[in-house]
Amino acid sequence: MSIDLEWCKLDSSLATYLVEVLNRQLGNAERPSFIGPVEVTSLDFGSASPDVELVDLRDIYRDFLEDDEEGSDRGPVKVTEGAEDEEGFEWVGEYDRGASIPATNVTSSLDTRSDQPDDQKAPLLPPPPAENPHPNLQLHLHVNWHSNLRITLTTSLLINYPSPMFMSLPIKLSVTGLIFIGELAVAYEGERRRVHLCILDDLDPYGPAGDRQRLLPSIYIESEIGQADKHVLKNVTRVERFIQDVIRKTVEEELVFPNFHTIVMADS
């Protein structure tokens, strides 16, 4: 079943948050000696929305619920990495959120006189639990996105001879589009009003890291080295390849299961 998205409603606040996530990842990424610090300066989602198809509807993965209980004091948006302890891990969770009510033994007396002491009266049955108006559910979506988004980055090309950082040339990079093909899990936890997001990969999530390039088979980048009012060198392959690797690594470390994002929704 296809799903239509109102892509135009993606606002600047989400773009600002994603810029912060990318800059955090870029700050921790190991850079080649010839590239200076990299910073994302702007992000535009573009006009091309992804093709989304609903492929499955199921119970929420147990990993989402357990992490939510352990990290209930965290901020409204968090990034969660899979725990190192893999004991009891269940890839396709079949977790029953319905809390069982313990059986209550009720002893009734044949003598129903009104003068029976209060402490000898039969205990009252507990009231039935209130039905949750927001049930838990998890959607699996197949996403095919030929994007025309635009991400602008700045960095510098370092010349380390005859001494370190002997010369620095400014670089402007623009990601002008990408292709994403994969499966996205969106889990809605109604009781706590939280949404968990992650990308599902065919590889074993706890196995050795594989080639995730198939999730982002194409990333289009334009590069300029030098100042705009002087000589400019365009489309430098080595710099563009480094940025492509960083983007793919960011997607893997931030969103590929068992890593996921949790968004805490405001109470209505």
Curated annotation (Swiss-Prot):
Pfam families named among the record's database cross-references: MMM1 (PF10296)
Compositional bias (Polar residues) at which positions?
102-111
Keywords recorded for this protein, A-Z: Endoplasmic reticulum, Lipid transport, Lipid-binding, Membrane, Mitochondrion, Mitochondrion outer membrane, Transport
GO biological process terms on file: mitochondrial genome maintenance; mitochondrion-endoplasmic reticulum membrane tethering; phospholipid transport; protein insertion into mitochondrial outer membrane
Q: Which GO terms describe its molecular function?
A: lipid binding
Signal sequence range: none
- SMP-LTD domain location, by residue? 1-266
Q: Where in the cell is it found?
A: Mitochondrion outer membrane; Endoplasmic reticulum membrane
> What InterPro entries is this protein classified in?
Mdm12, MMM1_dom, SMP_LBD
Please list the residue ranges that the record marks as compositionally biased, kind Basic and acidic residues.
112-121
Q: Where are the residues of the annotated region Disordered? A: 66-136
Coarsely, its chief localization is: mitochondrion
Q: Which GO terms describe its cellular component?
A: endoplasmic reticulum membrane; ERMES complex
Q: Member of which family?
A: Belongs to the MDM12 family.
Q: What is the UniProt domain comment for this protein?
A: The SMP-LTD domain is a barrel-like domain that can bind various types of glycerophospholipids in its interior and mediate their transfer between two adjacent bilayers.
Please report the name of this protein according to its UniProt entry.
Mitochondrial distribution and morphology protein 12
